[in-house]
Amino acid sequence: MSQLVRPTLELPAGRRKVLLHSCCAPCSGEVMEAMTASGIDYAIYFYNPNIHPVKEYEIRKNENIRFAEEHGIEFIDADYDMDNWFERVKGMENEPERGIRCTACFDMRFERTALYAHEHGFDTITSSLGISRWKDMNQINGCGERAAARYDDLVYWTYNWRKGGGSQRMIEISKRENFYQQEYCGCVYSLRDTNRHRRAQGRERIHLGVKFYGVEEKL
C-alpha cells in the first residue's frame, strides 16, 4: 500500500452518523477504510438505478456487498428503480457526460439517500462518487447539498476524498481486493458513447463482467 499517511477525518461540527451513498466498490473502498480508520459511525446505501444492464448492476452491487461484509459494515440495498430513472432523464439521452443528464441522475440518487437518512437517524450524508477523477466534484457536491437541504436535521459532507493520497489508495485497494473494473460510468447512454469512442479508435467494444483490478499483473 501507499506510504502516504491517511489523514484522520473529522465530521462536520456536531455530526455523528454518516450514510455513505456508494456507487461501486472501487470508488467506495478508500472512503470506507478512511472512515473506519477514523472511528466514524457509518452505513452504506446502495441506490444506483443508473447502472445498466441488470447484469452489470448485479456485479457492481455484489462486489460492494462483499467488501462491506469483510469490514462488518451495514449495507443497505435500495430498490433498483430503473423505470423511474429513465423517466427522470427523459429528453436528455444525448447530453454529454458531466452535463444536465448527470446532474439529474445525481439529484435522483441523493434525494433518495437523503430521505433514507432522515427517516433512519443519520445526520450526515456523503458519496463515494467524488473520489473519481472522471467526475466533476462541484457538480456532485451541489447535488448532494441540494438533497440534504430538504431536511433541517441533515447535511451533505463535501469532503474531498481525492486529497491526501485518496485517489492513489483507491486504486491500490481495488488491486488488493481484485475488484471488478467497470469501463463506463453506468447508464446505457454512457455505455453507448464509450463504445462509439472505442470504435472510432479502432478498439474493441466493452465486454461486461470480464475485467478485474490487479488480475493481469498476477498473470
From Swiss-Prot:
InterPro entries: QueH. It holds the Pfam family QueH. Signal peptide: none annotated. Disulfide bonds join C185-C187. The keyword Oxidoreductase applies. GO terms for biological process: queuosine biosynthetic process; tRNA modification. It catalyses: epoxyqueuosine(34) in tRNA + AH2 = queuosine(34) in tRNA + A + H2O. It comes from the Bacteria. Keywords: 4Fe-4S, Disulfide bond, Iron, Iron-sulfur, Metal-binding, Oxidoreductase, Queuosine biosynthesis, Redox-active center, tRNA processing. One of its GO terms (molecular function) is metal ion binding. Belongs to the QueH family. This is Epoxyqueuosine reductase QueH. It comes from Bordetella pertussis (strain Tohama I / ATCC BAA-589 / NCTC 13251). The gene is queH.
